[in-house]
Amino acid sequence: MDKYSLESVLAKGAELVKRKGIKCLVIDPYNKVRDTNATSDDVNRYTMDYLSKIEQFCKKYDVLTFIVAHPTKMYKGQDGKMEEPTMYNIKGGGEWYDASYHGLLVHRNYEQKNTKVKVLKVKFQNLGENGAEAFFTWEPKSGCYIPEVIEEQQKEDLPWEA
């Protein structure tokens, strides 16, 4: 598969905003969409410039952009289990944490056969809670992830139920 340039993806995104009124753009995966106009070979500088261009695009067109960035190779810990990645495990990780408004982890646990979604960063606390997590199970018949209900959750009233 050929690599796409960030400039061409953002130009197509701008076109889709005007023609179709899109409100969300997904870049997946990050490492296949290269910033061909990058001025630095330094990974941290490259990452910061990349994220700055996306932030400018989002503000200009009032679009939410999701960037799917896979971590570097993860290793098993001393307990034999795969470590849970953080934003720092993405190449240029410090910049990902510093420059992003939000960060979500989607981590598959093969032993428990579920997937965890965890909030790693929320810039504005009224939009979420750092460390909040939810678990999902893949349902192959429907092709959907089904939320797992934890016993503690069943006992607590949700804010709109109180």
Model regions and ranges:
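C-terminal regions of RecA-like/P-loop NTPase motor modules
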Residues: 3-25, 38-39, 53-61, 73-162
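Walker B catalytic acidic pair
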Residues: 29
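Residues immediately C-terminal
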Residues: 32-35
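Alpha-helix N-cap and loop-to-helix initiation/capping positions
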Residues: 39-46
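Well-ordered, non-membrane alpha-helical segments in soluble/globular domains
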Residues: 46-52
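Conserved H-loop
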Residues: 63, 68-70
